[in-house]
Amino acid sequence: MFYNSSKILFTTIMIIGTLITVTSNSWLGAWMGLEINLLSFIPLLSDNNNLMSTEASLKYFLTQALASTVLLFSSILLMLANNLNNEINESFTSMIIMSALLLKSGAAPFHFWFPNMMEGLTWMNALMLMTWQKIAPLMLISYLNIKNLLLISVILSVIIGAIGGLNQTSLRKLMAFSSINHLGWMLSSLMISESIWLIYFIFYSFLSFVLTFMFNIFKLFHLNQLFSWFVNSKILKFSLFMNFLSLGGLPPFLGFLPKWLVIQQLTMCNQYFLLTLMMMSTLITLFFYLRICYSAFMLNYFENNWIMEMNMNSNNTNLYLIMTFFSIFGLFLISLFFFML
């Protein structure tokens, strides 16, 4: 993917756009960075010559353009409010800005475009959408102090992200609803501390990369492919099982560490109701991860094995297994490191 010169150019511009947004000291500058990011990400989405990727890029453009328009309008209103002695309600304007940023990040209740769009993307584009494209909106959300709307979005995101993945047969939609659920956890960490949000985002990005990397190299897009996937290779199926559990946040895997930090901070802030909802939603996500892995282990369609033939000694497979090792034993290694300090 990244060996194409045009893709390198657009990826670089996309990164620059995000950095402009993050380092900007005005809403107008942040809007400009978001637009640069948007206009460079669309060519990356629509590069493949198939109908679904073109449709996905159009959906992304329309939703992001709507959010950008609302953000620009609200930014102008804020500038007018500062010049007109606060005759315009600043809290209402900030709420509109928050809604636009939640739409950009794909958080509930503005999530409806996200799973459908994910279905038309390649795995590497889906990974960028789930990780890098969330940095700028979440950083801008951290500048706003509107707890009530953020709390509603957190509750809806964790519930919809958990329940929405229950009846999915597409792995891309499954990862999309998982991303919405994790986004709820990230938004809740934004209410507490920016450093905890960054830690959560880094760990989530790594775990998402491990899974999408595997799905990409083995060309897996639907659940029924997992049933016929390497019947004779129990190691790869076991690694898939462990990575799903780590992404779900089950101890003692690496994915539990960021959730542990969020749980600890929410407990200190006496947010017991929110914490209970978030933990219940995590149990639901772990349930459908376990159901997928149980089916992949127990249901084998031997007549379809020829579809998934690949070189088991490839460098990609070895890299995936190395990353899986850190996904499984990362929490132990980090604990050992701090213990030795």
Swiss-Prot record:
Coiled coil: none annotated. It comes from the Eukaryota. One of its GO terms (cellular component) is mitochondrial inner membrane. The chain crosses the membrane at residues 8-28, 61-81, 95-115, 121-141, 146-166, 174-194, 195-215, 238-258, 273-293, 321-341. One of its GO terms (biological process) is mitochondrial electron transport, NADH to ubiquinone. Keywords: Electron transport, Membrane, Mitochondrion, Mitochondrion inner membrane, NAD, Respiratory chain, Translocase, Transmembrane, Transmembrane helix, Transport, Ubiquinone. GO terms for molecular function: NADH dehydrogenase (ubiquinone) activity. It is a multi-pass membrane protein. Its EC number is 7.1.1.2. The keyword Membrane applies. It catalyses: a ubiquinone + NADH + 5 H(+)(in) = a ubiquinol + NAD(+) + 4 H(+)(out). Its main location: mitochondrion. It holds the Pfam family Proton_antipo_M. InterPro entries: Complex_I_Subunit_2, NADH_DH_su2_C, NADH_UbQ_OxRdtase_chain2, ND/Mrp_TM. It is found in: Mitochondrion inner membrane. PANTHER family: NADH-UBIQUINONE OXIDOREDUCTASE CHAIN 2. Core subunit of the mitochondrial membrane respiratory chain NADH dehydrogenase (Complex I) that is believed to belong to the minimal assembly required for catalysis. Complex I functions in the transfer of electrons from NADH to the respiratory chain. The immediate electron acceptor for the enzyme is believed to be ubiquinone. Belongs to the complex I subunit 2 family. This is NADH-ubiquinone oxidoreductase chain 2.
